[in-house]
């Protein structure tokens, strides 16, 4: 976990400022994935720990670790770009890198860009991402990620 936190901080240094705002920091406990192939015995509950820091109204940085649908540990790091807001939801993409999927790239790191919608309240938020299937290497799903701001 130390390496993950160090990597997240390193990636944010380009945007680092002396006036860090804790109200822009979100913490999440992983994902819930509703898989398109529900008959494959995949893990829907994907517990973990992640962080998201809202840089401005359109950009945020994210990193975390979770137990994926193949029941293996995955790490991710990336950035959200959400230039549109419709009915209170920020719309855009999240791009970055993932690892830990045994059938995808031998469990190694791979890039991904996913469409995402986010709702952010005062204390709680929700990210909804569409994960497209990748042949027999990565199973498609709609993934939900609850997030909370710490006081």
Predicted regions and their residues:
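Predominantly the C-terminal beta-signal and adjacent terminal strand-loop region
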Residues: 19-21, 120-151
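Sec-dependent signal peptide recognition
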Residues: 1-7
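Repeated loop/turn-to-beta-strand initiation elements of outer-membrane beta-barrel proteins
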Residues: 25, 57-61, 87-89, 119-128
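Solvent-exposed loop/turn segments connecting transmembrane beta-strands
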Residues: 36-44, 66-75, 85, 99-110, ...
């Amino acid at each position: 976990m130390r390496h993950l936190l160090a990597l997240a901080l390193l990636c944010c240094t380009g945007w680092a400022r002396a006036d860090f705002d804790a109200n822009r920091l979100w913490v999440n406990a992983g994902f819930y994935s509703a898989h398109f192939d529900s008959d494959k015995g995949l893990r829907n509950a994907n517990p973990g720990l992640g962080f998201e820091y809202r840089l401005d109204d359109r950009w945020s940085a994210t990193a975390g670790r979770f137990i994926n649908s193949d029941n293996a540990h995955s790490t991710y790091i990336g950035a959200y770009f959400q230039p549109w807001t419709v009915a209170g939801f920020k719309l855009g993409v999240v791009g970055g890198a993932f690892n830990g999927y045994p059938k995808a790239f031998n469990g190694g790191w791979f890039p991904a860009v996913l469409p995402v919608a986010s709702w952010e309240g005062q204390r709680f938020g929700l990210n909804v991402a569409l994960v497209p299937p990748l042949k027999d290497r990565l199973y498609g799903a709609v993934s939900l990620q609850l997030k909370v701001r710490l006081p």
